[in-house]
């Protein structure tokens, strides 16, 4: 597991440059400061790769700063950003440790390759132990259209593959809040009591990082399910409720390792193998796409 530096706090001016500082009050009066101290504290937990996030995330973070400064508001937001911790479930555990060391009441996991929408703050209208928005996980091509086939919300279903049924978003067109058995972690708000519950019995690293998120495996080393499925299964078993606000619909950038792309294209080429084109086809494909340790990252 790779450890790297973390940045404890990002301000509006750091996100959008010095121009953002103009819309943040330079002085906060005593009444406003007092009201902020009474607000519910949300820690935004953001695991990054190569210190990169999407532009909509940067915009959301700036909006959080401004939202927390509004007179009469209910929420105040802080940020914990860690960079290049791997694997992702370990990054989440490090963020859980920072959360437990803070006075925050809610942790909001945001994956760095997601694209928040204007409805993001509606998550805090829902009183649930765990509440999430949706974003496309899987896709399929249909004619000239690319459709999301999996929106990261699931119910148990023994008759379906792996025992889970992906719920169709088109069934919820009125912004319904629904109960589910599992959600993806990339846009997930968790109450403090949930993290504290699992931290009590979690194994810990030498720095105190609790193993709350992990990929359970069988003796052969094969994974049983992903870390978010496992976390949700344990949360439901412990009596916590999980909800989805279906009007919070984010985008999702799926990044591909170019070596995987090369293997896919190689297979496609071999399927249509033509002896006469071997020299000009496969060689050019290999030279173009076989990039050692070259991974596509968010820009």
Regions found by a protein language model. Give the residues of each.
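Short, Asp-centered acidic motifs that coordinate Mg2+ and/or phosphate
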Residues: 106, 130, 242
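A short, glycine-/small-residue-rich helix N-cap motif at loop->alpha-helix starts
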Residues: 86-91
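Conserved catalytic core of nucleotide-sugar-dependent glycosyltransferases
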Residues: 96, 117-216
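N-proximal low-complexity "stem/linker" segments adjacent to membrane-targeting elements
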Residues: 2-85
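Active-site nucleotide-sugar/metal-binding loop of Leloir-type enzymes
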Residues: 93-106
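Short beta-strand-to-loop acidic/aromatic patch adjacent to the donor-nucleotide binding site
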Residues: 104-115
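C-terminal catalytic/acceptor-binding lobe
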Residues: 2-30, 37-38, 197-299
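Alpha-helical elements of Rossmann-like donor-binding domains used by nucleotide-donor carbohydrate transfer enzymes
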Residues: 60-63, 94, 122-123, 230
């Amino acid at each position: 597991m790779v450890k790297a530096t973390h940045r404890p706090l990002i301000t509006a001016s750091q996100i959008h440059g010095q121009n953002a500082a103009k819309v943040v009050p330079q002085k906060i009066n005593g009444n406003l400061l007092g009201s902020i101290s009474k607000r519910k504290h949300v820690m935004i937990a953001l695991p990054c790769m190569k210190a990169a996030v999407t532009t909509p995330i940067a915009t959301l973070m700036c909006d959080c700063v401004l939202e927390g400064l509004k007179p009469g508001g209910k929420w105040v937001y802080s940020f914990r950003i860690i960079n290049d911790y791997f694997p992702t479930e370990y990054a989440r555990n490090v963020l859980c440790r920072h959360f437990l060391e803070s006075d925050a009441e809610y942790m909001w996991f945001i994956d760095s390759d997601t694209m928040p929408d204007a409805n993001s703050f509606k998550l805090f209208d829902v009183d649930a132990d765990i509440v999430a928005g949706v974003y496309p996980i899987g896709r399929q091509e249909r004619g000239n259209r690319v459709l999301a086939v999996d929106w990261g919300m699931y119910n148990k279903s023994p008759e379906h593959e792996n025992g889970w049924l992906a719920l169709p978003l088109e069934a919820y067109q009125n912004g319904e809040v629904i109960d589910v058995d599992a959600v993806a972690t990339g846009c997930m708000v968790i109450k403090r009591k949930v993290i504290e519950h699992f931290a009590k019995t979690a194994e810990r690293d030498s720095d105190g990082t609790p193993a709350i998120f992990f990929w359970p495996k069988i003796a052969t080393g094969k994974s049983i399910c992903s870390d978010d499925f496992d976390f949700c299964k344990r949360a439901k078993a412990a009596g916590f409720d999980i909800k989805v606000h279906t009007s919070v619909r984010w985008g999702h950038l799926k990044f591909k390792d170019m070596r995987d792309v090369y293997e896919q294209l190689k297979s496609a080429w071999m399927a249509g193998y033509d002896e006469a084109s071997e020299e000009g086809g496969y060689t050019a494909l290999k030279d173009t796409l076989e990039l050692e340790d070259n991974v596509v990252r968010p820009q």
